Amino acid sequence: MKRKKLWMLAAILTCGLELTACSISDNATKADTEAGTKADLTVLTEWQAGKTVSDKIVAAYGGLDKCFAAEPIPDGVWARMQGKTYKENPYIGRDDLRHIRALHWDYDNQIHVGEMICNKQIADRVVRILRQLFDAKYPIQRMLLPDVYGADDETQMRDNNSSCFCFRAIAGSTKLSKHARGLAVDINTLYNPYYKDRADGTRFIQPATAAEYCDRTKSFPYKIDHDDLCLKLFTEAGFEWGGDWKSCKDFQHFELIGE
């Protein structure tokens, strides 16, 4: 009888130790998960454009509605723009512009954090369009401020970056671009290039690496054409598409009509 009692006591103690170990392990796993979630959340709380996030992190942040907004330009972003996309000028200032936060999908079905600077006149429209594109899982490869590329348009286009504001002239001209006022948006720029056929038979292309994408009869990722959702949404919102221009073609480009 004593042996039986001792055996039962040993079994109870062993079970208790195992339960305690399981509890400690579960608590450690929970702590690790919470720490990981907190670390991942900083991608959104600090709005780290270019980083990827999961549906779970978006939900923990507060949901999709919180991830699409147009706000006054934060001090840190404004500092990054100085001497790059923004130069002192008499035409447009900080109060005329807005910082857009948005999420976007890529072709690999990953969610990316994006940002864009645009004129306050079109900010709400652009946010609405970007949300509709996200809801439709429309692929946009990158949405970074051109300042990341030193405000060099050729460089950012080669990287297929999508953007809006940059205080600069039209290529090959001294006339200010609609981008200089934040009234034009370029989407998936490598695959939707600008080109102009010259009188001498040569063709000027931007980005220079996009010659193969000037042939719009071909099928390739990120292509904008007349059946494209991005084109539909921008034109419905009062923008014109550079792909319809006669003297040149700018397939990436949407600018506000009449401004």
Predicted regions and their residues:
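Bacterial N-terminal signal peptides that target proteins for export
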Residues: 1-9
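N-terminal module-boundary/linker segments of secreted carbohydrate-active enzymes
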Residues: 32, 36-110
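Catalytic cores and adjacent binding grooves of peptidoglycan-active enzymes
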Residues: 42-47, 170-176, 182-259
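C-terminal motif of bacterial Sec signal peptides marking the signal peptidase cleavage site
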Residues: 19-21
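Active-site-adjacent loop/helix surface patches within enzyme catalytic domains
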Residues: 139-183, 189-194
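Gram-negative bacterial Sec-dependent N-terminal signal peptides
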Residues: 9-17
